[in-house]
Structure formats: C-alpha cells, structure tokens
A protein has these predicted regions:
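Beta-strand/loop edge motif enriched in small/polar residues
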Residues: 2-233
Length: 233
C-alpha cells in the first residue's frame, strides 16, 4: 500500500478510505482544536518503528467515527517485513497539553478498536499537566479488544496518570461499552492479564483535584472495570 497524499490538517497520510495517523495531532489554524469526522476511518500508526502520534490539542471526535489500532508490528495487512513504514500502534497518547472530546450518540457511537488484521491493542494513555484544568469526555463510545500489552504497558483502556496538586482533572465516561471478549479468546489470555476499563494512577501522591464521573457503562472480559491507585509517598 502506498500513500496517496499527506493531509496537513490531520497530520496524517491518506490511504483510500483510511486515514493513517502517524504524526502529532496539532491544530494548524491556531484554534488548538482538531476535528475527526465520521466519513473517515482513522488508524493510529507508528512510522518506521520510531514516531507515534500524540494528541497535543483538543481533539473532537464526531459521532459515528471509528479509530483503529494494532499490535505495533506488521503493516495494515498484518504482515511484518523490513520494508514496512506504517504499523498500526497499540496506544493513543494524550499529552499534557491535549484532550479528547468523544461524544457519540446512541444511534452513532464512536468506536475504538483493533484493525481486523491485528488481534488487539492497549488503550488511550492520558498524561495530566503539572497545572491548570483539563477535561476528557467519552460518551456513547465502544472500546473493543483493548487492554493488551503490546510494545509498551498501559493499565487500562483509558489510563490516566501524573499531574500535581495544581492540576484539576475532569473525566466523563457515560454510556460506554468496554469489551475485550474476542481478544481474550483469540490470544488465549486470562481476563486477569487484561487491563482495566478505566484506570487512574496518582503514583507520587500529587493530590490531583480529580472529578471522575463514570455512569451507564458496561465492562466485559477485563481484569476489572474501574481501578484507582494512589500513593502518599
């Protein structure tokens, strides 16, 4: 598969009906907002085994949009060789200056899942800033076959960590479905080997002001639905 063109607005390469996202997601117009639309399917990829995309602005995902991931090895077709440039990546990283607003609807949910040629993926990893307020929202979203540990380690399909006592973090998860049944079956894993649905870790005892609201959501074939870890050290 050869790239047809570069879409500067999305920092990605366009393969027919797939948008291969391999560079940082940043706003080109100064608005600090990038929108992903349902008429495209986005594949999170590493480039040449080195670069992988990170969210560095507010990413708004439109209802009905699909975002695909992979194991980090093999191309879009799942075949690995030395000539592969773009490999579906298992982790979607949200940096300190980024956030995600994924508001689907009952009729048009947003889907985060593995591309069919890869058995699974890890999760969305959110790093909190040292100060200021940040909000991440997931409504009517499907998280399918995540929670594996490919290329790197994540604790959950939504994995939040760091921040300080000067950080205010808001997380809304509503009417979301977390289901890794096919991953557990196809890779012969125990559910204890899969990450949590939503994980929050304050490892350094930073006492982040966290407002986390999880409602009307289901969790299936995961080590646990919701997990939180704090430290006073």
């Amino acid at each position: 598969i050869m790239p047809q063109n570069i879409t500067a607005e999305d920092n990605s390469v366009n393969y027919d009906n797939l948008i291969i996202v391999s560079d940082d997601i940043v706003s080109e117009d100064g608005s600090n907002v990038v929108r992903w639309t349902k008429d495209k399917t986005y594949v999170i990829c590493s480039k040449n085994m080195v670069n992988r995309p990170t969210v560095k602005c507010k990413l708004i995902i439109e209802p009905g949009t699909t975002i695909l991931f992979g194991t980090g090895t093999g191309n879009i077709d799942g075949i690995e060789n030395s000539e592969v440039v773009y490999r579906p990546y298992p982790i979607f990283i949200v940096e300190e200056d980024g956030s995600i607003e994924a508001k689907g609807t009952k009729e048009k949910p947003i889907t985060f899942k593995n591309i069919d040629t890869h058995v699974g993926w890890n999760g969305i990893e959110i790093f909190l800033p040292d100060n200021g307020e940040v909000t991440d929202t997931f409504e009517y979203c499907n998280f399918i076959n995540g929670g594996a540990q490919y290329r790197d380690f994540t604790e959950g399909l939504i994995d939040v960590s760091y921040g300080t006592e000067e950080t205010k973090f808001n997380l809304v998860v509503d009417h979301c479905n977390f289901d890794s049944t096919e991953l557990v079956k196809n890779v012969d894993l125990q559910t204890s080997e899969i990450g949590a649905g939503v994980y929050y870790g304050d490892y350094d005892g930073n006492k982040v002001e966290a407002n986390i609201k999880i409602s009307n959501s289901t969790f299936k074939s995961l080590s646990m639905g919701i997990e939180g870890v704090t430290s006073d050290d």
